């Protein structure tokens, strides 16, 4: 990859515009989960300590483009940064014609999605962003799969475009896992729908030595093997695809393990009674909400022997404790493994957090959609742009 790294540049006295992913949950004007901001702090501190005039841009939520809405303002992020950084941090809401920023100061530019043309990668808006800086830094892996004015267009027209440490680290970790993995390589793909992750399953099935499916995705595979799934979430129209993937894995000398025991409930609620059953005993009015202990033990053994682990998606409804034992067992097996492990996706990160294994995962990806598209082998527009600018 011919990408320029921000850390290799002399930033002293330069106007540096950093696109970060500060799209954090806010309630009552306060940031309620600061993981993304914390992940971004290293980049900000490096630029500030290098003597740069630092501007940061990000989106927050999904406001109506072209309209200011205080509910989507980055002011709570500015308040947070003022508490944790030792420099002046201010918010600029009218910035397209220029920003007054001094060396060692930080100016946060108001939500880019308030600007008309942001989502469409508008060329005129991109050029306005680019004119604000001497150096454009793309550091938001979570939005690298979107070709938008702040993530893509601005970098095309800026005098210099480079990758920030967060983005560079993410690409390096994912590249290590996918392009030169320690074997055996194992991928866990969970979540609710096969349809949204079918291309991921297909792409990974050609790369990994062992594919594990969980959640609603596993229900479709259970149905494909001729078992009743009752009222469980599954996709009947994708049973042929599941059978094709099962057959392909077998032809390659491997297999996709289908749960042998499951935990069921009669309703989707925190109060639902959990019942352990053999997969062949699921009743018509049952809903499968987790894998059973025998399945969890078998999967944990596969995880224990892996050289590389990619984890995207829980294997059960872990938000409800009675249906969380399967995901907990998977999480603990990954934590105890000596493999190089990567976890990504919102629900996965919530599980990592719930079971307290953050420091046992080799790399935690900040991207959701971008993480999946990278796993699929798709080119990420922001990365392609940085490669072109670095050539």
From Swiss-Prot:
EC number(s) recorded for this UniProt protein: 2.7.2.3
Pathway field: Carbohydrate degradation; glycolysis; pyruvate from D-glyceraldehyde 3-phosphate: step 2/5
A GO CC annotation given for this chain: cytosol
UniProt KW Kinase keyword: yes
Keyword Transferase listed: yes
Assembly and interaction partners: Monomer.
Taxonomic lineage from the root: Bacteria, Pseudomonadati, Pseudomonadota, Gammaproteobacteria, Alteromonadales
Annotated Pfam families: PGK
Keywords: ATP-binding, Cytoplasm, Glycolysis, Kinase, Nucleotide-binding, Transferase
An example Gene Ontology biological process: gluconeogenesis
Ligand binding (ATP): 197, 319, 345-348
Source species: Pseudoalteromonas atlantica (strain T6c / ATCC BAA-1087)
Location of this chain's protein in the cell: Cytoplasm
Name this protein carries in UniProt: Phosphoglycerate kinase
UniProt family annotation: Belongs to the phosphoglycerate kinase family.
Catalytically driven reaction(s): (2R)-3-phosphoglycerate + ATP = (2R)-3-phospho-glyceroyl phosphate + ADP
Binding site for substrate: 21-23, 36, 59-62, 113, 146
GO MF terms, alphabetically ordered: ADP binding; ATP binding; phosphoglycerate kinase activity
Domain of life: Bacteria
